[in-house]
UniProtKB/Swiss-Prot annotation:
It comes from the Eukaryota. Its main location: secreted. Expressed by the skin glands. This is Caerulein precursor fragment-related peptide BM3.
Amino acid sequence: GIGSALAKAAKLIEGMV
């Protein structure tokens, strides 16, 4: 759902930072 999508985005952003 939307929650999992946000979690994925957060993980990707953290990996970039």
